[in-house]
Amino acid sequence: MTSIMRTRVSRAWTALLACLSVLALVALTAGCGSARSYGRTQLTVWSWEPSMPQLVKGFEHDNPDVHITLVTNARYEELNSAIQDGYGMPDIMQLEYFALPQYAVSGQIRNLTTRTDGYEAFYTPGSWASVGMDGNVYGLPMDSGPMAFFYNDTVFKQAGVDASKIRTWQDYYDAARKLKTIGVNITSDAGEASFFDAMVWLAGGKPFTTSRDGHDVGIDLLGDAGTQEFARFWQRMVDEDLIDTSTTMWSDAWKKAVGDGTIASVFAGAWMPSLLLADVPGTAGLWRVASMPTPNGNATNAENGGSALSVLTSSRKPDASWRFIDYVCHSRTGIDTRVKGGAFPADVATLDSPEFLSRTTVTDSHGVQVPYFGGQQFNRVLSEAAKHVSTQYQYLPFEVYARSDFRSTVGKAYTWANNWQRYRMEYQRMLAGKTGNARNPQSPGLMVTIEDGLSQWQQNLREYGINQGFTVTDN
């Protein structure tokens, strides 16, 4: 073979190899999802936070070496399935405060204590306590939900009640009776576990305890003073038909009742303003915010809601994951983005800032500023509420299950109360000859009280805990 021919063959092979290399690179890039993400650290984040797409975009801009895949529709069921299967877990998961201990005790989320030195003073006591167990830190607070009293001022005034002066549970009961005279329920509760837990917390209850090593669990729903105090108070409200026990919060029926004033107030977390505006826009200007009434009027409070970002133990990219959650939860940019999107902050600086405290409007989905609370500087009330959250309440290390079981146990008391009210109404209509039926209406059956439900709930929780390998005691 001549030198000319060898040169031509060599050039041909070189060209062919170059083409193959390009094709291989294209195939590899396609396998990664896009050319934009090739060569970058890949993180998967599961979060339902509305502002998260904007946060991801901002983080990627500041950290071009990281590409994030955001999944917005995955919750605990999907996470538990992925953990059980051993694959498909995200690197970072948004966890509500009540759920975090369950994943910390089981070793599914990373201990971040060494990364968070000096962070405690940055956050409110309630939110910081919610990401810790046994002196260790398992996430960064993303938002918080100190309880507050949201009420339709116009409806309360129609009943002759100044809701801003309600300080104690007795005041609240008296107001409920006056509202009932004009055909209005002071609130609704169809048996919500999160609400029940928050009210027990508010009353100083400590029905659940977990040992420092996470192995021993105490459950005392029947003997705990705070639990029993709220159960007795709420049973009185239910027995006297002062609350709506048939309408589930966030349902269409609930939105209608809140909108027409037949449900006059809500005990909820400080995240409520943007949701009230979204769900009941027609009552803008009628509502106000006050601090929570407590058993004796003391300035104590509880959390209802709030969440953190945690890094999964299974993640092989803990450093990049930490950079992301620190950006979202600790940087000024991340916090401001979430607060502008309607989240209630967990950090002290925002809660104390003049701009935040002086706000009189709520931002709707189109960016319009709406004076939903009639010009009130509502964040002053909510910021103060955050400062009074007690830090002694503990969630169960299987709280996700506990809340799912609440409706089938304690919830039966609300169902019975609803059936009893229906029976009474039908019976009275029958006596008045308005039914066209001489037979008695269907009986609601044996009475079920909140105390009965708590007894069954405690039994179920005890059995579940033992089956999960915990040592469970009835304190």
Spans of features found by a protein language model:
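Conserved C-terminal helix/tail region of periplasmic/extracytoplasmic solute-binding proteins
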Residues: 380-475
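Glycine-centered hinge/linker elements that transmit conformational signals in sensory
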Residues: 176, 216-248, 288, 292
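C-terminal lobe and pocket-closing loops
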Residues: 272-283, 297-303, 311-409, 472-474
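Hinge/lid segment of periplasmic solute-binding proteins
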Residues: 97-147, 199, 288-290, 381
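Extracytoplasmic "Venus flytrap"/periplasmic binding protein-like
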Residues: 58-123, 157-160, 255-257, 261-265
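Extracytoplasmic/periplasmic solute-binding protein
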Residues: 138-142, 147, 170-220, 226, ...
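Short, solvent-exposed loop/beta-turn-alpha elements that line the ligand-binding surface or hinge
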Residues: 113-125, 165, 187, 206-229, ...
